[in-house]
Amino acid sequence: MDDMMRAMDCLNMAATLRNAALASATCTGRTLGEDREPIWVEGSRKTPEPPLPEESPAPEPNNEIPLLPKIDFEPNISCFPDLQAINASIVRRELEEEGKRCVRQQLKAIRDKQDAMRLSRETQQRKEERQRDQLQQKALRERNESLLIQKADQMTAAQLEAQQREQLALRQQIDQKLHKLALEGVSRCQRRFNQKYEGIAKILLSLNPETVKVCAAQNTQLKELGQKFEQLVSSVKMGNCEMQSQFLCSIIKAEEFCKSLDALELDIIKQLAEFSEQIQQQLKMEAAKKLEDERQRQQQQEEERQKLEEQQKLEEQEKLRKEKEESAAKEKQQEAETAKADAANVPAPLEPKSQDVPPAATATSTSVHPDRLKFYNDILALYQSKVDAVKPLQTEESLKQYRTGCQRAINLPLNAISAVSPQHLAQNFDKLYSFFAGQPTKVMNGTITINDHPLARDYCMLLMAKKFVSQTETAICSNPQAAFPFASVIITFWKLLPDFGKVFLAYMYKESPFLVPYVIPQQQGQTPEQYLKTIGYRLTDKNELEKPDIYLKRQTGLARLYAAVIISQGRKAAGPDECFELNEGWLWLAHMVHVKPLPDISATLIMEILQTLGFELWRTYGKQFVKLLVYIQNIYMPQLAAYDEGGPKTRLEMLLAKFLRERQIAQAVGVLPPGFW
C-alpha cells in the first residue's frame, strides 16, 4: 500500500493499479482505519447515532486526489440498510466517482504530458536526423565542389598557360613591329635633326668670335640637344624598351628634340638680330655722338668767334671813345684859351654827367641763364638717347610679359617706401637695388632678372625715375613729409648709378621746366593753349586743359621733391659723396629771381623752395642768404607785382616779411636725421 500511495503521489497510475491488484489478493479484512465492531453489534447496543460524516471540501484545481471520508460503520449485506447507511453509501459513491474523475483527469493530464514529451522527443529526433542529413549532404556537396574546383583550377591553369604563351608570342610580334616603327620614326627625325643641326653649326661657324660669344648659351644648348638625341637613337637601336609605350615615347621625344632645335634656331636668329640691331644702335649712337660733338665744337667755335668779334668791337669802341675824349679835350683847351681872351668873366658851361645805362636784356637772359640752359640740354640729350635705345624692348610684343615683370619688380617696393623705420626703408631699397644688381626677383609669373635682356637696365632705370616723379602727384601732394624718404632713396641710387640721377632730373624738368629754372618763352604764332602745354599743363579726360589749382598743386609737389633731394642724405653704406648739394638750391633761387616772372607759378615755387630749403640755406650762407631775401622782397616782388596780384604773390610777401622779422626759418617737418638708415 505504501508503494501504491507513493505511486499515487508520483501520479503514476499504471503502477498504482498494479500495486492495488497485488494487494487485493492478500487482503482479508479492512485495510484502512481503526478496528471497530460491526455495525449490527453497535446497533444492538443502541449506541447513539454517529454523526454524519462531514463533506470533504471540493478538490483544489491543482489536481490532487481527494481523500475518502471516514465511515464509522461498515455495511453488511445481511443487515437491513437504513437511511444513514444509504446516505453514506451515496456520499461514498459520489466521492468515489469524484475521486475517479479526478484520477481520470490526472491520468489524462499525465498522458497528455507524456504524449507531448514523446512528440517533442520525436520532433527533436527528427530534427537531429534532418540536421545530420543536412550536414552529410553539405559535406558531400563540399567534397564535390572541391573536386570541381580542383578540376576547374587545373583546366584554368592549363588555359591560362596557353593564353600566356599566345600573349607572349603576340607581344613579341607587336614589340618587333613597334621597334621597327620606332626605328623608322626616329630615323626620319634623325634626318631632320641632322640637317637642322648642320645648318645651325654652319651659321655659328660663319660668325666672328665676338658674335659667337653672344650665342654662347645657345651653342651650349645645341651641344646638349645633340648628345641627348644621339643617346635616344642608340637606345632605340638597341631596343632597350621594356614597355610598348616607351617605343611611342621615343618617337615623341625625337619630335620634341626636333622642335627644340627649331626653337633654338629661331632663338639664335633672334639673338643675332638683336645683337645686330644693338650694334646698329651703337653705331647710330656713336654717329649721333660724333655729330653732337661736332655740333658742340662748331658751337664753341662760333661762340669763340662771337666773343672775339665782341672783344674787337669793344676795343674799337674804346679806341673811338679815347679819340673822342682826346678831341674833346683839345676843343676844351682851345675854348678855354678863347674864353680867357674874349670873355674872362663868363664861366664855362657845366659838362653833363653821363649816366650808366644797363645793357639791354636779350630774350635768352630773361628766360634762362646760359649755363642752366646748357645743363638742361645735356640732361635731355642723355634722356632722349636712353629712350631711343630701349625702343626695341619697349615695342616688342613678345617681351610684354617681361616688361610687366620689370614693372612689378620696381613698383611694389617703390610704392612701399616710407620713413616708418630705418629697417623698413632699407628693406625696400634693398629689393630695388638687388634687382638692379642682377639678382633674381620673384614676380607673379615666375622669376626674372635685369640681365635677361641687354636693354633692361636702361629701361628699368627710366621706369624707376618716372615712378619716383609720379609720387609727387599722389603720396607727396597729400603728405609733404613723404618727400624725404623718397628723396633719400633717390640720392642713394644717384650715388650708385650716376645716370639714374640725370634721368630723374630729366623727368623733373619735363614736368616742370621752372626747376631749371627755365621760363619757356611763347613763340610767335603759338596759341595760349599750346603755350600752357609747353610749361607743364595737362589735358583732362575731356581733352580740356586742367584747372590752374590742379596745375599749381602738382608743381608744388615737384618743387617739394626737388628741394628734398637737395638736402637729403643717402644711406650710410652708399658712401659720403654728395651728388646734388645745397648749392643747387642757392643757384636755383639766384637764377629764378633774374628770369621773367609768371603769374602764380613763380611765387608758388619760390615759397615752396624757401619753406623746404630756407633753414639749411640760412645756416650755410648766413648774411648772403639774408641779402638774397632782401633782394627778393625789395627788387623781385615789385617786378612780380607787374604780372601777379593773386594769392600766391600775397602769401610770398607775408612769408618773406615773417622770415626777415623773426630772423630765422624753421626746419621743414619730416627731414630725415643724418645716418637714419
Curated annotation (Swiss-Prot):
GO terms for cellular component: cytoplasm; nuclear pore; nuclear pore cytoplasmic filaments. Residues 49-60 have a biased composition (Pro residues). It comes from the Eukaryota. Gene3D superfamilies: GLE1-like (1.25.40.510). GO terms for biological process: poly(A)+ mRNA export from nucleus; protein transport. InterPro entries: GLE1 (IPR012476), GLE1-like_sf (IPR038506). It is found in: Cytoplasm; Nucleus, Nuclear pore complex. Residues 122-179, 280-346 form a coiled coil. GO terms for molecular function: inositol hexakisphosphate binding; phospholipid binding; translation initiation factor binding. Transmembrane segments: none annotated. Residues 34-65, 113-136, 294-366 are annotated as: Disordered. Residues 34-48, 294-340 have a biased composition (Basic and acidic residues). Keywords: Coiled coil, Cytoplasm, mRNA transport, Nuclear pore complex, Nucleus, Protein transport, Translocation, Transport. Belongs to the GLE1 family. Required for the export of mRNAs containing poly(A) tails from the nucleus into the cytoplasm. May be involved in the terminal step of the mRNA transport through the nuclear pore complex (NPC). May associate with the NPC. This is mRNA export factor Gle1. It comes from Drosophila melanogaster.
